[in-house]
């Protein structure tokens, strides 16, 4: 099976807590090695520049972040603690939805975006116990406070001319946010732990699923910008 995917804008209109959404986005940008800027929030969430600037200014007044001289957004201790809490609840919700409820892998991210804002600390603690303190979410991303393995983006791998079989370690938020793309990944077995081959073709990256013999069983192509959020290792 061969799939070509074109990037589309994220649909975040139904998320219910803008402050928490921005805090989580900043933390995710840091996690992906991307400098947190207002422009990056515009890219991630699809909000207008003026809306993002107004929200960031309010968050700075509330003591959740600082806008540095180089325009970088730096979370305060209070902001980081709250961002970590929201991200942890989000990833616990994803594990619950997949492992216990049995929701489709491609759908759990969108649903967890709603749960993260309404989950109480009591429920969070019970989920940690119920799920046996999971170390990663369904897309290979570590629970906040837990270190992850050494991995780099598929974009970096192809730009550095890395060849041979690679392993998907984790899938970043911009890919998770599109259920259609995730479904295409899932159909080809492209989950964390899957063996893949990568190749650049202009401004897109071909991600080839490899079978046990190392042969290509199918592939999809994604924009280079999205490949930056597919993290792989040589293991």
Where are these regions (language model features)?
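Short, intrinsically disordered or compositionally biased N-terminal tails of bacterial proteins
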Residues: 1-12
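Mid-protein regulatory/catalytic core that forms ligand/cofactor-binding pockets
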Residues: 4-5, 116-228
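Basic amphipathic alpha-helical segments that dock to polyanions
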Residues: 22, 41, 52-62, 185, ...
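Short acidic, hydrophobic short linear motifs in intrinsically disordered regions
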Residues: 32-42
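Key DNA-contact positions within bacterial/archaeal DNA-binding proteins
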Residues: 50, 106
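A short, conserved structural fragment
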Residues: 60-70
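Basic, amphipathic "hinge/linker" alpha-helix immediately C-terminal to the N-terminal HTH DNA-binding motif
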Residues: 71-90
């Amino acid at each position: 099976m061969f799939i070509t995917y074109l990037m589309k804008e994220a649909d975040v209109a139904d998320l219910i807590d803008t402050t928490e959404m921005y805090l989580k986005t900043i933390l995710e940008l840091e996690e992906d090695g991307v400098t947190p800027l207002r422009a990056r929030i515009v890219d991630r969430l699809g909000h207008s520049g003026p809306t993002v600037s107004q929200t960031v200014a309010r968050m700075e007044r509330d003591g959740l972040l600082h806008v540095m001289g180089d325009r970088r957004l730096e979370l305060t201790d209070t902001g980081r603690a709250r961002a970590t809490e929201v991200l942890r609840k989000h990833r616990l919700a994803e594990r619950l939805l997949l492992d216990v409820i049995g929701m489709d892998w491609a759908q759990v991210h969108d649903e967890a975006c709603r749960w993260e804002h309404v989950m109480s600390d009591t429920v969070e603690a019970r989920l940690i116990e119920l799920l046996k303190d999971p170390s990663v979410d369904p897309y290979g991303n570590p629970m906040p406070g837990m270190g992850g393995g050494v991995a780099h983006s598929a974009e970096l791998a192809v730009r550095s001319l890395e060849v041979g079989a690679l392993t998907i370690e984790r899938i970043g938020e911009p890919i998770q946010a599109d259920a259609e793309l995730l479904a295409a990944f899932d159909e080809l077995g492209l989950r964390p732990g899957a063996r893949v081959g990568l190749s650049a073709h202009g401004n897109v990256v071909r991600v080839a699923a490899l079978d046990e013999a190392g042969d290509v069983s199918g592939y999809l192509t994604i924009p280079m910008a999205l490949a930056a959020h597919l993290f792989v290792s040589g293991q």
